[in-house]
């Protein structure tokens, strides 16, 4: 009996200390885990904020440079009274003289062109560094859109397109309705390449009269290349999508154009949630649930945050 009482007495004295010690250890571990999580969240938030600001700044510069250059060209065409009815030769000469200086300084300049209120069109398309194709429609081409192999009129033709009217194109009609500098929606060019593009648009005025639209293309392939370079510098996946959650450009490999899926018919741009990159796909799926106005959110890919 005395031995049992001694054991019980020891247990009664030691057990509270053991339980208190274990509770303190667990409490300290919980506090440390909480502090670690908070530190990780704070560092992640700061890094994400830095990446977002840096990428936004670079993206703004990428788009602003052709946007403002296009306005400058539009102003000069109107100021120097270069437009003539059914004859865009003077605008052609001006665009040709400006193409190399602007193209060398703004690599994302893919096409620069002018569409007139009477259906004329002239443009230069960059096929390679300092190599351009002239695209022309006026009285000299019998009102057909002729695409040449070089930057000047000659007998070396790439293609001829009948019944081309720039006034009904997605880059002309929005400016005709609201004459102000703006970006076009994403659309497909009507040349022989039929590439998907985004265009900077500016109205052209001559003696305060609206005479046409100056257009500068940023092709989506060029946009993708820019985002791919950003990914290498920033170590972050980047993508741009429209209000319908369809991809405009992304930093990974592959086209944004669908070859045919249950959600995206052939020729349509893919949904961001259909991208083969699991990080982009997971992020896009979260945006589908929370909407485009959400700020910061967390996703998991292969059990990694």
Regions found by a protein language model. Give the residues of each.
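Intrinsic low-complexity, intrinsically disordered coil/linker regions enriched in small/polar
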Residues: 153-159, 163, 167-168, 179-182, ...
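Extracytoplasmic/periplasmic sensory segments of membrane signal-transduction proteins
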Residues: 65-182, 227-230
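Juxtamembrane extracytoplasmic/periplasmic/luminal helical "stalk" adjacent to the first N-terminal
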Residues: 7-15, 21-110, 181, 197
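Short, Lys/Arg-rich, polar N-terminal cytosolic tail immediately upstream
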Residues: 1-6
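Short, small/polar residue-rich loop motifs at catalytic or cofactor-binding pockets
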Residues: 108-109, 193-198, 232-235
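Glycine-rich acetyl-CoA-binding "A-motif" of GNAT/NAT acetyltransferases
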Residues: 210-211
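Sensory beta-strand/linker motifs that couple input domains to effectors
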Residues: 32, 214-216
């Amino acid at each position: 009996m005395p031995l049992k009482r001694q054991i019980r007495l020891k247990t009664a004295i030691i057990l509270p200390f053991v339980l208190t010690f274990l509770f303190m250890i667990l409490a300290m571990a919980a506090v440390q885990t909480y502090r670690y999580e908070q530190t990780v969240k704070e560092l992640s938030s700061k890094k994400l904020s830095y990446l977002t600001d840096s990428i936004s700044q670079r993206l703004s510069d990428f788009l602003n440079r052709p946007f403002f250059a296009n306005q400058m060209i539009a102003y000069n065409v109107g100021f120097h009274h270069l437009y003539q009815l059914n004859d865009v030769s003077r605008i052609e000469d001006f665009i040709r003289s400006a193409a190399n200086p602007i193209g060398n300084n703004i690599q994302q300049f893919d096409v620069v062109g002018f569409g007139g209120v009477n259906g004329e069109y002239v443009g230069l398309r960059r096929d390679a560094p300092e190599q351009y194709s002239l695209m022309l429609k006026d009285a000299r081409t019998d009102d057909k859109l002729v695409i040449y192999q070089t930057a000047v009129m000659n007998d070396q033709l790439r293609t001829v397109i009948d019944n081309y009217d720039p006034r009904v194109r997605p880059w002309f009609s929005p400016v005709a309705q609201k004459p102000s500098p703006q970006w076009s929606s994403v659309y497909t060019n009507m040349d022989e390449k039929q590439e998907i593009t985004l265009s900077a648009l500016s109205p052209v005025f001559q003696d305060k009269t609206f005479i046409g639209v100056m257009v500068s293309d940023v092709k989506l392939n060029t946009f993708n290349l820019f985002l791919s370079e950003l990914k290498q510098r920033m170590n972050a996946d980047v993508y741009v999508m429209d209000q319908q959650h369809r991809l405009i450009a992304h930093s990974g490999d592959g086209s944004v154009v669908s070859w045919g899926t249950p959600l995206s018919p052939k020729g349509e741009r893919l949904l961001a949630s259909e991208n083969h990159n699991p990080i982009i796909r997971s992020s896009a799926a979260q945006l589908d649930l929370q909407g485009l106005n959400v700020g910061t959110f967390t996703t998991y890919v292969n059990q990694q945050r």
